[in-house]
Amino acid sequence: MIGAMLRKVTGLPVVTTVHSDYRLDYMGRPLSHLTFGTINALALRRLDYRIGVSDAMVDLLISRGFPADRFYTIYNGIDFTPPPTQGDRLEYLRSLGADVDENSVVVGIAARMNPVKDMATLVRGFAAGHAKCPRLRLLIAGDGPEKDKLTALAAELGVERQVCFAGWISGGMDRFYSALDINALTSLSETFPYALTEGARFHLATVSTAVGGIPYLIDQDVNGYLFQPGDWQALGNDLAALGNDDELRRRLGEKLYEKASTQFSIQKTVSTQLQIYASILRRHRRRSSARDGVVICGAYGRGNAGDDAILEAILQEMRSIDPDMPITVLSKDPRSTRLTYRVRAVHRSNFLAWHTAMWNSRLYINGGGSLIQDVTSRRSLWFYLANIRAAKRAGNRVQMYGCGIGPVTRESHRSLAAKIINKYVDVITLREPDSLEELRAMGVTEPEVLLTADPALILQKAPDDETDSVLLRAGIPPHGNYLCFALRRWKGFEEKAPLFGAAAEYAYRTYGLTPVFVAVEKHLDPGAGQLAARGLTIPHYFLDDAGGAGTIIGALSRMQAVVSMRLHALIFAAG
């Protein structure tokens, strides 16, 4: 609140770090929520910049209407210097009241017992896990208003001897974490809790709710387990699996330590904080002018990984030129575009919004992909041509970026496209020679034309752990011998679909390649894969949502061969 009041007086940029969801800060205290909570919520919207302590916190605020390009992300880092030896484990655990022996597998949590931490789910999940793995013990460090209820719940479930309520731990937390085998968290809401990185420092296998920034640390089945809030059955299964498998605990704990110590150290946090302050100062000093930045228009926000990869590549190029450049994207799903790319985004049909953006920008990019064509829709051709004309008339330089041209079948459309492009476009970059020939055949002679490559080729694959997690979530072993089918519904596909199934059978029986049906456009392509796989008598998998371009590239890099009806599946495979 004070920062919001001083903002205009000082003329300085004001930034705040958001550690928690302001709507939950005063849970259970209605008067404080009504007063302090309301003041905080209003003040937060009046600041220049905000730093979220996880990407999930930033996403939450963007989804509530905060400007997407005014956020930074920083993660809580800790010192990963190896801790000293903490002494006898059993002696320490027994001093806290835990009923343990040499064979016990100890699950631990350090948290306040309040509704947000949802420890009832922890106790229920532990009881379910203990039924399958009697070695399990639960150690709870902390206190709070729900302690009596949790104690009664443990007794009701018959695990009162196996659950130890240790209260607040004195003498630091290193000894507590060093005595655990499994670190657990059951919160309904978090940003990025220190409890998990503290556990990672001690190489602990970890089970947590998939809330806040936690999925950015834990890759499912790769370096830990995630479950949905309140799902005590899933928690119980995870605890039992870890309790019964010493090697699994060791492996997951080591993988989590590797990631946390590299990406979530205190050194990384300090470096990121300094970079954020430098960026804010640059943006504050940036000369304000009537026109600044770029408007980007394409087939974005439709769930097509190829089109979204083009946008990602364009944004990467723009930010390499000017990291502080204002960017507005015309999208069919502006909310998703804002959340994914942290840019301003307006709906394609919101004429007033994108027209206003054009009058404030310096550059308009029509890109990329095959936008100038009338096979899938003539209305889309009219839309893109109208936007090109509007952008130029608004005073922008106009570039068609990474394009494929055609087919434009109607003569009237060819004439209209040539007229608009000749009059209003400054530069065109094309991704293949056929498009150059098509432009010449249409009579386009005025813009500068350059033959380059598809923008998506500059994108890199995601880290292996992220790719492994995407595959494992789909039930696909990360390292097999695979043949990818990236299919789509097209005219006559229903009749031809069995041929893809026959090819999959042949490849499996002849070369030992297991078919994986990958959806490039996740809203449309899964049905094509299901149709082709109908009647298969061999093992096969479906990857209906491989995430962003990086993880799709990573997934396709695990394939021995790719059969594709989608151009960008081939481009991703080549990358």
Name each model-derived stretch.
Residues 188:
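Aromatic "clamp/platform" in nucleotide-sugar-dependent glycosyltransferases that forms part
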Residues 146-149, 160-169, 176, 225-226, ...:
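Active-site donor-binding acidic/aromatic loop of nucleotide-activated sugar
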Residues 105, 109-128, 138, 145-151, ...:
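A conserved mid-protein helix/loop that constitutes part of the nucleotide-sugar donor-binding site
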Residues 283-575:
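Active-site anion-handling motifs in enzyme catalytic cores
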Residues 168-169, 175-180, 553-557:
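Short alpha-helical donor nucleotide-sugar binding micro-motif in glycosyltransferases
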Residues 13-15, 23-46, 59, 405-420:
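Nucleotide-sugar donor phosphate/pyrophosphate-binding loop at the beta->alpha transition
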Residues 45-72, 78-82, 428-446:
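A short, active-site helix/loop in glycosyltransferases that binds the activated sugar's phosphate group
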